[in-house]
Amino acid sequence: MKYFIVDAFTDQPFGGNPAGMVLLDSDTFPKEELMLQIATELRYSETAFVKRHSAQEFTIRYFTPKAEVELCGHATIASFFLLHRKGLASGQCLCHTKAGDLHIEAGEKVMMQMAKPRIIATIDETEDIYQALDVKNYCPTMPVQIVYAGLPDLMIPLPDVATLQALQPDMQAISEITKQLEAVSFHVFAFDNDGYTAHVRDFAPLYDIPEESATGTANASLTYYLQQCGCLGNEAECAFIQGEAMGRPSVVTTRIQVDGNLFVGGRAAVVAEGTLMIEV
């Protein structure tokens, strides 16, 4: 099996969010235990296992070093950028995932249509959430909500970018809270007048990801959240900057349409290629 390391949401190696990608050469996926072992060996936040049916149809399964997840935005962007570069995908593609079927435009910039977004819950008692971030200055005008655009993520507003960059997150507390709320991550954001829609940080220690430098799914959820809060119109394009505190700045592009369809995407850079010397 061929494997690749691809940095998503950047056009430069060692920027953006790295993902592992395994291109399968059989009609069936390996056993789950083996895919988990491979993801653990590669040590990236997510590894995508890609099965190609044709140049326009694929199936992807996603594994963190700890568990399988239904969807990973940045690993999908990375995978289709690589497939395009290898001449294995072009134009409008259909991708089957456990979160549902995704419509993807494969090219030098990859855009993927997300699952129909929805607000799962509004969290009224937020003291423990902000305490887990060591934040005392809340953002009282905007709610803390669990939003779904393929995965459930907790949207947490902060009053300014300085507070965002100075966070001292308690990973154990975040793990416990996300487990209790059945959410994947704390997706924390703040506004600034610098041309970006928002600056964001994402913490998912429950899935062995202390912090992620670019999170496609969660930023899609944030786009819908901001629209529902009245910060965006019925149709909008957004650019979220993430990963600054990690030294891996990433730009995640999103688009929400009048019909409610939601897209997320960006560029990528292929960093490495190799062969897994194992028998399936």
Language model segments and positions:
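Active-site proximal loop and beta-alpha junction motif in alpha/beta enzyme cores
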Residues: 1-71, 77-280
